[in-house]
């Protein structure tokens, strides 16, 4: 599929968002409105107009959405999409902190895994309580 046919599948508002000049873009819309399709088209448009895929960072709320976006762009562009990065907001922030912890006042920090979280939770709450971690939502 060519970039023109991909853009041709979008409505007017989606096409405007997909073809914005090389600048940051925030796509906010309700469920089922075509956000993913628009973001895929935007990434494909940027790559097809000369932006290296490695210079594009796509943010998504879930890992599934981030993975789906990258897979769809690769499906449309093939090797040109190599290096495209999409991640969750959390993963992106963790990446930034790992790269420059001193900027965030986090030098020497450690991220703990779920087992360590449970052990800490038990110590704080008391071992006789439930072993279930609270829902993070």
Q: Which residue ranges define each predicted feature?
A:
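ATP-hydrolysis module of ASCE/P-loop NTPase motor domains
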Residues: 21, 77, 81-84, 102-137
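P-loop NTPase Walker
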Residues: 1-104
């Amino acid at each position: 599929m060519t970039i023109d046919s991909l853009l041709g599948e979008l409505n007017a508002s989606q096409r405007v968002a997909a073809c914005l000049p090389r600048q940051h873009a925030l796509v906010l819309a309700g469920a089922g409105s075509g956000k993913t399709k628009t973001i895929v088209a935007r990434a494909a448009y940027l790559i097809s107009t000369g932006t290296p895929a490695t210079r594009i960072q796509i943010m998504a709320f879930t890992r599934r959405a981030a993975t789906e976006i990258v897979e769809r762009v690769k499906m449309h562009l093939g090797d040109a999409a190599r290096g495209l990065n999409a991640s969750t907001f959390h993963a992106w922030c963790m990446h930034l902190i790992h790269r420059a912890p001193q900027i965030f006042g986090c030098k020497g920090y450690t991220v703990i895994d779920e087992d360590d979280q449970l052990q800490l939770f038990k110590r704080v709450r008391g071992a006789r309580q439930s072993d279930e971690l609270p829902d993070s939502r």
